[in-house]
A protein has these predicted regions:
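Class I SAM-dependent methyltransferase SAM/SAH-binding core
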Residues: 59, 69-115
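Conserved class I S-adenosyl-L-methionine
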Residues: 2-52, 67-71, 161-195
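Class I SAM-dependent methyltransferase "Motif I" SAM/SAH-binding loop
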Residues: 62-66
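A short glycine-rich, Lys/Arg-flanked "PGG" loop and its adjoining helix->strand segment in the class I
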Residues: 144-156
Length: 266
């Protein structure tokens, strides 16, 4: 478990690599999987524009290199954001490229599966929590606990937004078939026909950077649990867990196949 907001390993490596170029490559490969990626970001930010005051505080949950934070703070000049993640490589990239965005962005190195992550945020309450393409990694028991914690952290009237591949349940096999078929077609077009760099090749290429050996060793240690078999929580579980966590309005505000933005108002 990290014991400081930015790891010592990350701090010493931010100038050794062209992180801006790697972030551009990251965005390109992510868009290969999700052609509607920017539309999904915009839909999430539209919600904040309608529901929140200008000077709100947001949590970028499982932030990676800070894609949400970057877009949110660019659109809302009076907002602040706390970006939290466990991946030392992506945190390093985000900090190197984005910095603190004029003192409005703070990075936190913490493990969402450990209960003490909330105490490391430095915020007693927030106006909004947002996450994209991340929480599907969590086993149901961790996801339900995190939603309970968010139910305490997000102020009444605040909002949680999760943009992710939220699967249809087993009672909807035709829906599952359509969504899976279209996803496979999207991937074939992006990575075979157009030859875009995919997730695995992006990571392999970055790992070949000689100066990042220690950083990747730390990453491997932190994510050893990912080698185990996992089952991504289906959409219905997310809804039930948010309701049990104290959110009063829950529904899909944007969707393309299984790619949805689940919105929950506290």
């Amino acid at each position: 478990m990290p014991n400081q907001e930015t790891s010592d390993v990350s701090q010493c490596l931010t100038t050794a690599v062209d992180w801006a170029a790697w972030l551009r490559r990251w965005d390109t490969q992510q868009t290969g999987y999700l052609p509607e990626r920017e539309a999904r970001f915009n839909a999430m930010l539209d919600v904040l524009e309608v529901l929140l005051p200008e000077n709100f505080v947001a949590l970028d949950l499982a932030c990676g290199p800070g894609a949400i934070s970057q877009r949110l703070l660019s659109r809302f000049p009076k907002a602040r954001c706390v970006a939290v993640d466990l991946d030392p490589v992506l945190l390093t990239m985000g900090q190197a490229v984005l910095g603190d965005m004029g003192g409005r962005l703070r990075w936190v190195d913490a493990d969402l599966m450990a209960p003490e992550w909330v105490g490391r945020l430095g915020e007693s309450q927030i106006d909004a929590a947002l996450s994209t393409t991340a929480l599907h990694w969590l086993a149901p028991e961790y996801l339900t606990r995190i939603y309970r914690e968010l139910g305490q952290l997000v102020r009444p009237g605040g909002v949680f937004l999760n943009g992710d591949n939220l699967k249809f349940g087993p009672h909807l096999p035709s829906f599952q078939k359509v969504a899976q078929t279209m996803k496979e077609q999207t991937h074939t077009d992006a990575f075979e026909r157009r030859g875009l760099e995919d997730w695995e090749n992006w990571w392999k290429a970055l790992q070949a950077e000689a100066s990042l050996k220690a950083l990747f060793a730390e990453r491997e240690k932190r994510f050893a649990w990912k080698a185990a078999e996992r089952h991504a929580p289906i959409f219905d579980l997310h809804v039930a867990a948010l309701r049990n966590g104290g959110f009063r309005e829950i529904g899909v505000i944007w969707q393309h196949m299984e790619n949805r933005v689940l919105m929950a108002v506290r």
